[in-house]
Amino acid sequence: MDQYCILGRIGEGAHGIVFKAKHVETGEIVALKKVALRRLEDGIPNQALREIKALQEIEDSQYVVQLKAVFPHGAGFVLAFEFMLSDLAEVVRHAQRPLAPAQVKSYLQMLLKGVAFCHANNIVHRDLKPANLLISASGQLKIADFGLARVFSPDGGRLYTHQVATRWYRAPELLYGARQYDQGVDLWAVGCIMGELLNGSPLFPGENDIEQLCCVLRILGTPSPRVWPEITELPDYNKISFKEQAPVPLEEVLPDASPQALDLLGQFLLYPPRQRIAASQALLHQYFFTAPLPAHPSELPIPQRPGGPAPKAHPGPPHVHDFHVDRPLEESLLNPELIRPFIPEG
């Protein structure tokens, strides 16, 4: 750490505190993520190892935050990242109204380029959300926080935890307890982020897992084996049933969005994971080639993080009161009225 001068605190993650720092010799500004080990015998946390491994696999992408160095420090170690001025959550929070169509296209295009690069290298991020999409001083968007990332097994045989992704961006298969999944979880999250940029607020702001499903059902309709055959194989499929609910046309949900935007959004927000449009295909969608064209990064808003104390983290969904099959349903809900329309009568 002697080669760096700490300039201030940026924030705090699951496994460490992040500082803004300056390299003493070169003057380069970086972000230092200090990871402390609770006990030396426990070794490096799995999330930190995953982040290092994932970033080493995809270090050549200009749309993924660059890991510059890893070095030991005290009873832990430090990750040195390129410094990014802000994040997409700050952009959305400070916007006085929904972003201009050209700005939405630009952010989404950069996000898709990063996701396409990750997926081409068999990396599934598993926690895409605006707070993990960092913005540089020049307006460049880069994907960060690979603590939940995994190297994807193309044969589909590996089992993973379903407790990944921040709830508002969590794919339906994860909400139904899927242990086998693929890049589709990232593509659903991209759709949620796109909808949030178009809407100015999250599309599916559930306060627990059941409310999250209800938010999705309210727009996309009740999933059925006819539309999504694999749903019957998911662990939590029969733990709660919902009344039949017809989908709401996306043009009613986002009346100001263009037909091209709604068409692309609809190809992300599909129940069957393998029917979701791939990131590489989405980049070729007509949405990006019709007026207005994507804005240049220099034309994008970059909210400055104020000096002094680090800004509070983007308010995400609370991770409490989750549904559990052995717990009375009314105890699992913060707002029981939200799901009442979906519960069968009798």
Swiss-Prot record:
Gene coding for it: Cdk20
InterPro entries to which the protein is assigned, alphabetical: CDK (IPR050108), CDK20-like_STKc (IPR048002), Kinase-like_dom_sf (IPR011009), Prot_kinase_dom (IPR000719), Protein_kinase_ATP_BS (IPR017441), Ser/Thr_kinase_AS (IPR008271)
Listed GO CC annotations: cilium; Golgi apparatus; nucleoplasm
Stretches the record annotates as Disordered: 298-324
Reaction it catalyzes: L-seryl-[protein] + ATP = O-phospho-L-seryl-[protein] + ADP + H(+); L-threonyl-[protein] + ATP = O-phospho-L-threonyl-[protein] + ADP + H(+)
Any one of the GO BP annotations: roof of mouth development
Highest taxon in the source lineage: Eukaryota
Domain Protein kinase: 4-288
Entry-linked Pfam families: Pkinase (PF00069)
Entry function: Involved in cell growth. Activates CDK2, a kinase involved in the control of the cell cycle, by phosphorylating residue 'Thr-160'. Required for high-level Shh responses in the developing neural tube. Together with TBC1D32, controls the structure of the primary cilium by coordinating assembly of the ciliary membrane and axoneme, allowing GLI2 to be properly activated in response to SHH signaling.
Organism: Mus musculus (Mouse)
Protein name per Swiss-Prot or TrEMBL: Cyclin-dependent kinase 20
Gene3D superfamilies: Phosphorylase Kinase, domain 1 (3.30.200.20), Transferase(Phosphotransferase) domain 1 (1.10.510.10)
Record carries keyword Iron: no
Subcellular location: Nucleus; Cytoplasm; Cell projection, Cilium
Active site positions, chain numbering: D127
UniProt keywords, alphabetically: ATP-binding, Cell cycle, Cell division, Cell projection, Cilium, Cytoplasm, Developmental protein, Kinase, Nucleotide-binding, Nucleus, Serine/threonine-protein kinase, Transferase
GO MF: ATP binding; cyclin-dependent protein serine/threonine kinase activity; protein serine kinase activity; protein serine/threonine kinase activity
Residues that, per the record, bind ATP: I10, G11, E12, G13, A14, H15, G16, I17, V18, K33
Record keyword Ribonucleoprotein present: no
